């Protein structure tokens, strides 16, 4: 039975051996794979390597095996005369022999015998190693072995005494057989070099010891044997470690400093041990040791002078790298060796602990003496390596392994504290490993460190002992080397690989244990890099130039493979500033060359993360598989599905910057138009400068980075020539600023494309599809033609950038529904096949109804927002007559259609819909957006049953403000001195209000705009008020102080003070009593009777130009209104007119014009919830007046079957005072209401909705059928959109265009159509072009989400290749 200390040694020995064997298997497999490519490789090398792998695998799996049989088999391979094993294969054989020898020797020292091993085999277990030793070191004179036997035994006892690192406990064991020493001393060095640097001490060990009685010898640590050959760790092996290599290096450097300090501190007091009775042979050894000590002291005095001289010479020799073999303690021979026993070990540990305390006390007293002797002793140690007699110098080490005492000091030196113990990984890297480090890195040592016990330096060794010294030169031949010259590859690979992979990430440094599937090109790169550098390794005072050519690789010198990669030619940047920034992806090597690709034939990477894993473009084209190709929605080019994710990111970045440059071009064209107008009104002297500015603006539109950089410098001189008071100077500054913005955008797009791998590159419309220079030179300066997307500015250059949407890119399938200002069509993108919903609005109607600002507001909100409960917009563009919004198509219809089919909803279904609507409104309010038109019609349902909010035409984000707040817009038509905008005077808000509900209610359709009709205002398609007739060609200028702000600027301008005006309705003239809740509203004054109220106090309609003040006229108007207004149908019939604004959902503050904010949306939400549960609006009336009166007086009928929670929520949402309304302080008030107790707000998007539409295909519009029946929308696309088809084919609009009027007013359709045809088309076109110059937009983030959705829905791409850092 073994004690706990011996069991720990056995466990550590097995772990260390298994780790070394695993690394050996990986190295052998890599060699086997690479040797199959070499032309000079023979089959015997492959067979031997495979056998070595099998032996290592078998040895690693078993705990106790007959390792002697493996040693004999490996020795037979080395001694084979038929097959001469050389090069890397020979190195592997010796490496495996070394591992097995270390494992076997530790077991021998512990007295371990295998269960299956007989006594006879135990006696002859070193025969195989003896044969190898005789075979490799036949030049060493063996005649002197018997003469120096006793002397060398003493030397071995002095040099073998180590501690166990996991437990810091000392185990004394027997001396190993000397013929096993070549494998135990084998340190991955060139064998010839090993023989050359053997010292006298080592030679005495090899020649003077043969078969030693293991039971009678001790003094050597087992750990010293199985750790003597350190592993040369590489970066690729760090996966096996659980701690940082940098931390390990710091630990080793600290131990180096401690060891050097201890050696400088003089001779400590020896540790006294119990001396048991010694056998006669050991007593003789002790006497011999005393004699040798006396001789050593005399020789040291004689050699001091020589050491000082040699020190000066060797300090001048340059040493770039110093190789250290770190040992935890120097050897000691103060006391005679003790046999292994548990009692001796325990006694030794207790004595050592006591000695340690004494040493710590003595250390404090001797610190001053140590500082004085430190410099002198350091120079002596560096100057001269230890003489042969130095091996008998008495040294001892304490059991704590932190106190080291030497003969030079009588006091111990306490070492620095080591970091906390880390759990050993699969392969333990110990402190005896070899490290290559520069001298500058060790800041604690002023001079290079040369330890006498690390690497012996004499090239001449003394054979013999005592007084007789026989000098013999150690010479080795190439045939008798322990390993071939290719062992240099192991050293160089370790160092070069460390240097080369310093900048790579941790994931790329890992390697799989199963190297058969590794797509590795580092072997070729490292070998070429090694041949290029050819730097010799310097190991202390021995300088040997290692051969660079290995037997298995005799290729001529070539440049590194990654520098020959042709894809490097494509990696160009516009300036040196961006050289260090590329590539975007993390890469440590480029892809292999064409020859390696033909050999590998590996499939593509699933997601390539570095150049070494990116297949070439040619390989993609050769293996083009339509089933694995996907269409990128951004650049609309096919790309492999495995690369779509990374490509989409780069594509979106490049195209977004390119689109910014295109928008700058639009502004430059607008400025050029302004300059053209101004040039007609100024004197001839200044006209030349204005024309020059216009030419520069148009020149900047058509050219790229280099030309525009020149224009910026030219503009500096032009601006200086302008008078500071000249208005044109501001335009010149604006032109220069726009050109600079364009150059910056193009640079960013160019950098994104050029710094990305070619396989990921995008087809940016401007970078890769720019017009040719020849066409530009032959064409006069002017704006380019952007097809239908920009028909205003036309030149002879018919250039349509790729990626810019136009109407010809879509195939219209059928109409879906129509609203107050346009229609919605189902369309398909021809190139990608995606289905969209396209909202088409006629420009002339937008101008006449003063809705241009609302259209842009809706576009900006859709472009700005990104939320799962808000409809996404992908494109916005225009033609000569129409404006288009391309949005996502939601097949589930809207809540209005759903309510029409169900009549009313279940409370749980309504709760889910309202909850998702609350999240949508919360998102909008957090971004300063008030929807102001929340109703069931605008709540769309997707294919999964979730809600999305749409129709932001009436929304308010503070986008309208006075001109003093915003800088002037240089492309506004008002700067030309003329105002050709034709529009009706919209309702004016109190403070900077927007024309929203008021204009919506007061806007009349084309049916009512004829020359003979009066200024009637339509609400729900019915005449509300009549005024003085207005000619159709009368143009009332809009207010100049109103200006459209960008969405980013408008975020900070959100206010709740604006409200639209209300048409002149007798809202408060009713016989019903005023609600007592209205009396509590602050600032509320009961209105006087209608016959006493001045008519001037009633807001007028937007189409009136004169008002009357007499009571008779007001009474006549009321009578005329009653005569012309037919009775309203029931609620489910007049609800179909909500497209032009249904008053059922208007908040009281909007009707009263006292200012409104986000609370108006919560009021509408309460109305919707009531309508979902009851099937009818809470304020429904037989007329619009009655509906408004019900809202202001809060006349609500509560059904009996409504739950108390629902009633309480509706009651609080319908509060008349906005400050008392639920949600005034935020959406959390609503979300915390008991009605939503069962709602999980965090996971609501993943919950199963109560209504999930059943869709036959992506083009299914069956859930919009109720709206089609109400609006009488025909499914026949040719019939319902005949004028539109003619516009596509003939580029002109028919005069009989389909109007947006409700079907109930069909009697006036013909008249309205005739009126539209008589409009001044020239004026309308001018105004349209002026207000839609900058309308083109592509939402690249939404398109990026389409690519991600495609990857999520499509089947994942399965590759046979496993990435290097995959687990």
Curated annotation (Swiss-Prot):
<dbReference type="GO" id="GO:0035556">
    <property type="term" value="P:intracellular signal transduction"/>
</dbReference>
<keyword id="KW-0808">Transferase</keyword>
<feature type="compositionally biased region" description="Basic and acidic residues">
    <location>
        <begin position="287"/>
        <end position="326"/>
    </location>
</feature>
<feature type="region of interest" description="Disordered">
    <location>
        <begin position="140"/>
        <end position="164"/>
    </location>
</feature>
<feature type="binding site">
    <location>
        <begin position="816"/>
        <end position="824"/>
    </location>
    <ligand>
        <name>ATP</name>
    </ligand>
</feature>
<feature type="compositionally biased region" description="Polar residues">
    <location>
        <begin position="1025"/>
        <end position="1034"/>
    </location>
</feature>
<dbReference type="GO" id="GO:0106310">
    <property type="term" value="F:protein serine kinase activity"/>
</dbReference>
<dbReference type="InterPro" id="IPR000961">
    <property type="entry name" value="AGC-kinase_C"/>
</dbReference>
<feature type="region of interest" description="Disordered">
    <location>
        <begin position="771"/>
        <end position="792"/>
    </location>
</feature>
<dbReference type="InterPro" id="IPR050236">
    <property type="entry name" value="Ser_Thr_kinase_AGC"/>
</dbReference>
<feature type="compositionally biased region" description="Polar residues">
    <location>
        <begin position="399"/>
        <end position="421"/>
    </location>
</feature>
<feature type="domain" description="AGC-kinase C-terminal">
    <location>
        <begin position="1237"/>
        <end position="1347"/>
    </location>
</feature>
<keyword id="KW-0067">ATP-binding</keyword>
<feature type="compositionally biased region" description="Low complexity">
    <location>
        <begin position="340"/>
        <end position="381"/>
    </location>
</feature>
<feature type="region of interest" description="Disordered">
    <location>
        <begin position="456"/>
        <end position="556"/>
    </location>
</feature>
<feature type="active site" description="Proton acceptor">
    <location>
        <position position="933"/>
    </location>
</feature>
<dbReference type="Pfam" id="PF00069">
    <property type="entry name" value="Pkinase"/>
</dbReference>
<feature type="compositionally biased region" description="Low complexity">
    <location>
        <begin position="1294"/>
        <end position="1312"/>
    </location>
</feature>
<comment type="similarity">
    <text>Belongs to the protein kinase superfamily. AGC Ser/Thr protein kinase family.</text>
</comment>
<dbReference type="InterPro" id="IPR008271">
    <property type="entry name" value="Ser/Thr_kinase_AS"/>
</dbReference>
<feature type="region of interest" description="Disordered">
    <location>
        <begin position="264"/>
        <end position="429"/>
    </location>
</feature>
<feature type="compositionally biased region" description="Basic residues">
    <location>
        <begin position="531"/>
        <end position="544"/>
    </location>
</feature>
<feature type="binding site">
    <location>
        <position position="839"/>
    </location>
    <ligand>
        <name>ATP</name>
    </ligand>
</feature>
<feature type="compositionally biased region" description="Acidic residues">
    <location>
        <begin position="506"/>
        <end position="517"/>
    </location>
</feature>
<feature type="compositionally biased region" description="Low complexity">
    <location>
        <begin position="979"/>
        <end position="1015"/>
    </location>
</feature>
<dbReference type="GO" id="GO:0005524">
    <property type="term" value="F:ATP binding"/>
</dbReference>
<protein>
    <recommendedName>
        <fullName>Probable serine/threonine-protein kinase pkgA</fullName>
        <ecNumber>2.7.11.1</ecNumber>
    </recommendedName>
</protein>
<feature type="region of interest" description="Disordered">
    <location>
        <begin position="971"/>
        <end position="1034"/>
    </location>
</feature>
<feature type="region of interest" description="Disordered">
    <location>
        <begin position="1084"/>
        <end position="1134"/>
    </location>
</feature>
<feature type="compositionally biased region" description="Low complexity">
    <location>
        <begin position="143"/>
        <end position="162"/>
    </location>
</feature>
<feature type="compositionally biased region" description="Low complexity">
    <location>
        <begin position="1092"/>
        <end position="1125"/>
    </location>
</feature>
<dbReference type="GO" id="GO:0004674">
    <property type="term" value="F:protein serine/threonine kinase activity"/>
</dbReference>
<dbReference type="InterPro" id="IPR000719">
    <property type="entry name" value="Prot_kinase_dom"/>
</dbReference>
<feature type="domain" description="Protein kinase">
    <location>
        <begin position="810"/>
        <end position="1236"/>
    </location>
</feature>
<feature type="compositionally biased region" description="Pro residues">
    <location>
        <begin position="271"/>
        <end position="282"/>
    </location>
</feature>
<keyword id="KW-0723">Serine/threonine-protein kinase</keyword>
<dbReference type="InterPro" id="IPR011009">
    <property type="entry name" value="Kinase-like_dom_sf"/>
</dbReference>
<keyword id="KW-0597">Phosphoprotein</keyword>
<keyword id="KW-0418">Kinase</keyword>
<feature type="region of interest" description="Disordered">
    <location>
        <begin position="1288"/>
        <end position="1312"/>
    </location>
</feature>
<keyword id="KW-0547">Nucleotide-binding</keyword>
């Amino acid at each position: 039975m073994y004690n706990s200390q011996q069991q720990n040694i056995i466990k550590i020995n097995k772990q260390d051996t298994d780790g070394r064997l695993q690394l050996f298997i990986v190295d052998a497999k890599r060699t086997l794979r690479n040797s199959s490519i070499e032309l000079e490789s023979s089959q015997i090398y492959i067979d031997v390597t495979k056998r070595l792998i099998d032996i290592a695998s078998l040895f690693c799996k078993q705990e106790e095996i007959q390792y002697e049989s493996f040693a004999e088999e490996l020795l037979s391979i080395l001694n084979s005369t038929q097959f001469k094993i050389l090069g890397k294969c020979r190195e592997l054989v010796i490496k495996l022999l070394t591992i097995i020898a270390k494992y076997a020797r530790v077991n021998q020292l512990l007295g371990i015998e295998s269960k299956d091993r007989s006594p006879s085999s135990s006696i002859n277990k070193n025969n195989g190693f003896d044969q190898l030793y005789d075979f490799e070191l036949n030049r060493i004179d063996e005649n002197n072995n018997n003469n120096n036997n006793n002397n060398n035994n003493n030397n071995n006892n002095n040099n073998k005494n180590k501690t166990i690192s996991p437990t810091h406990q000392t185990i004394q064991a027997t001396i190993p057989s000397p013929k096993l020493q070549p494998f135990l001393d084998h340190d991955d060095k060139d064998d010839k070099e090993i023989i050359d640097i053997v010292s006298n001490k080592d030679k005495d060990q090899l020649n003077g010891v043969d078969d030693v009685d293991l039971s009678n010898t001790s003094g050597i640590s087992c750990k010293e044997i199985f750790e003597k050959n350190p592993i040369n760790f590489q970066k690729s092996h760090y996966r096996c470690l659980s701690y940082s290599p940098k931390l390990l290096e710091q630990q080793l450097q600290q131990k180096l400093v401690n060891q050097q300090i201890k050696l400088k501190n003089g001779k400590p007091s020896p540790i006294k041990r119990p001396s048991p009775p010694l056998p006669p042979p050991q007593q003789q050894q002790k006497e011999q040791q005393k004699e040798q000590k006396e001789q050593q002291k005399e020789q040291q005095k004689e050699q001091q002078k020589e050491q000082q001289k040699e020190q000066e010479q060797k300090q001048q020799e340059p040493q770039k790298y110093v190789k250290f073999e770190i040992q935890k303690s120097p050897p000691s021979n103060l006391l005679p060796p003790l046999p292994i026993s548990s009692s001796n070990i325990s006694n030794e540990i207790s004595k050592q602990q006591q000695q340690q305390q004494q040493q710590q006390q003595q250390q404090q007293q001797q610190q001053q003496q140590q500082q004085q002797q430190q410099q002198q002793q350091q120079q002596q140690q560096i100057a001269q390596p230890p003489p042969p007699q130095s091996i008998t110098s008495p040294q001892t080490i304490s059991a704590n392994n932190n106190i080291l005492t030497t003969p030079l000091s009588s006091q111990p030196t306490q070492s620095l504290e080591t970091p906390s113990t880390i759990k050993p990984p699969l392969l333990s890297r110990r402190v005896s490993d070899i490290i290559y480090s520069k001298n500058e890195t060790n800041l604690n040592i002023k001079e290079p460190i040369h330890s006498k016990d690390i690497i012996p330096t004499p090239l001449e060794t003394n054979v013999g002992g005592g007084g007789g010294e026989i000098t013999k030169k150690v010479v080795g031949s190439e045939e008798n080397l322990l390993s071939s010259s290719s062992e240099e590859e192991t050293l160089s690979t370790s160092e070069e690989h460390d240097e080369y992979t310093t900048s790579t990430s941790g994931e790329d440094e890992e390697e799989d244990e199963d190297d058969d599937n590794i797509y590795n090109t580092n072997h070729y790169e490292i070998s070429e890099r090694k041949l290029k550098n050819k730097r010799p390794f310097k190991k202390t005072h021995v300088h040997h130039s290692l051969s660079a050519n290995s037997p298995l690789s005799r290729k001529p010198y070539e440049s590194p493979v990654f520098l020959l990669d042709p894809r490097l030619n494509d990696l160009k940047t516009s300036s040196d500033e961006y050289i260090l920034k590329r590539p975007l992806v993390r890469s440590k090597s480029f892809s292999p060359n064409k020859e390696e690709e033909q050999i590998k034939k590996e499939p593509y990477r699933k997601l390539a993360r570095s150049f070494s894993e990116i297949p070439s473009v040619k390989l993609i084209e050769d293996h083009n598989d339509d089933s694995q190709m996907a269409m990128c929605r951004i650049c609309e080019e096919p790309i492999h599905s495995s690369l779509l994710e990374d490509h989409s990111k780069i594509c979106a970045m490049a195209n977004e910057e390119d689109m910014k440059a295109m928008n700058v071009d639009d502004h430059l064209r607008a400025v050029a138009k302004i300059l053209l107008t101004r040039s007609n009104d100024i004197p001839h002297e200044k006209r030349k400068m204005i024309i020059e500015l216009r030419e520069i603006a148009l020149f900047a539109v058509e050219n790229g980075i280099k030309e525009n950089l020149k224009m910026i410098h030219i503009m500096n001189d032009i601006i200086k020539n302008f008078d500071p008071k000249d208005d044109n100077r501001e335009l010149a500054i604006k032109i220069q600023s726009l050109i600079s913005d364009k150059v910056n955008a193009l640079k960013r797009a160019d950098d994104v494309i050029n710094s990305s791998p070619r396989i990921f590159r995008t087809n940016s419309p401007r970078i890769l599809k720019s017009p040719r220079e020849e066409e530009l030179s032959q064409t006069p300066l002017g704006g380019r033609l952007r097809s239908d997307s920009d028909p205003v500015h036309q030149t002879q250059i018919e250039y349509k950038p790729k990626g810019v949407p136009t109407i010809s890119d879509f195939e219209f399938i059928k109409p879906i529904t129509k609203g107050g200002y346009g229609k919605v069509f189902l369309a398909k993108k021809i190139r990608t096949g995606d289905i969209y919903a396209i909202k088409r609005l006629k420009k002339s109607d937008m101008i006449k109804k003063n809705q241009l600002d609302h259209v842009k507001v809706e576009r900006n909100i859709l472009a700005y927002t990104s939320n799962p409960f808000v409809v996404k917009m992908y494109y916005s563009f225009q033609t000569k007559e129409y404006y288009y919004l391309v949005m996502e198509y939601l097949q589930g219809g809207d809540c209005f259609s759903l309510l029409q089919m169900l009549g009313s909803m279940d409370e749980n279904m309504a709760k889910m819909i309202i909850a998702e609507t609350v999240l949508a409104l919360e998102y909008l309010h957090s971004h300063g957006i008030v929807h102001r038109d929340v109703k069931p019609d605008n709540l769309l349902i997707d294919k999964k049953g979730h809600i999305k909010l749409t129709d932001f035409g009436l929304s308010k984000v503070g986008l309208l403000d006075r001109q003093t707040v915003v800088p002037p817009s240089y492309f506004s038509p008002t700067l030309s001195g003329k105002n050709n905008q034709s529009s009706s005077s919209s309702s004016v808000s109190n403070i900077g209000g927007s024309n929203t509900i008021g204009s919506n209610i007061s806007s009349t359709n084309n049916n009512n705009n004829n020359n003979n009709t009066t200024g009637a205002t339509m609400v729900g398609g019915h005449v509300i008020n009549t005024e003085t007739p207005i000619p159709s060609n009368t143009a009332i200028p809009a207010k100049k102080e109103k200006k459209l702000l960008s969405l980013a600027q408008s975020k900070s301008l959100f206010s709740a003070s604006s409200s639209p005006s209300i048409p002149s309705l007798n809202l408060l003239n009713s016989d019903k009593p005023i609600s007592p809740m209205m009396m509590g509203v602050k600032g509320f004054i009961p209105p006087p009777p209608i016959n006493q109220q001045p008519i001037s106090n009633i807001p007028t309609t937007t189409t009136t130009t004169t008002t009357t003040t007499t009571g008779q006229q007001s009474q006549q108007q009321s009578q005329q209104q009653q005569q012309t207004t037919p009775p309203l149908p029931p609620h489910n019939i007049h609800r179909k007119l909500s497209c032009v604004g249904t008053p059922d959902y208007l908040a009281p503050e909007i009707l009263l014009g006292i200012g409104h904010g986000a609370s108006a949306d919560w009021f509408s939400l309460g109305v919707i919830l009531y309508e979902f549960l009851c099937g009818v609006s809470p304020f429904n009336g037989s007329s619009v007046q009655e509906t408004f009166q019900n809202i202001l007086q809060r006349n609500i009928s509560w059904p009996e079957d409504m739950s108390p929670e629902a009633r309480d929520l509706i009651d609080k949402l319908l509060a008349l005072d906005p400050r008392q309304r639920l949600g005034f302080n935020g959406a959390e008030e609503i979300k915390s209401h008991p009605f939503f107790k069962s709602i999980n707000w965090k996971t609501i998007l993943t919950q199963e909705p109560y209504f999930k539409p059943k869709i036959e295909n992506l083009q299914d519009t069956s859930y919009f059928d109720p709206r089609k029946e109400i609006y009488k929308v025909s499914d026949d696309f040719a019939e319902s959109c005949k004028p539109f088809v003619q516009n596509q084919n003939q580029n002109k609009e028919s005069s009989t265009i389909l109007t947006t009027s409700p079907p109930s007013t069909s009697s006036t359709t013909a008249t309205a159509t005739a009126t539209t045809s008589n409009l001044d088309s020239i004026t309308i076109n001018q105004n349209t072009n002026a207000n839609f110059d900058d309308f083109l937009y592509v939402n690249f983030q939404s398109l990026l989400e389409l690519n991600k959705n495609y990857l999520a829905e499509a089947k994942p791409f399965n590759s046979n290749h496993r990435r290097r850092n995959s687990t």
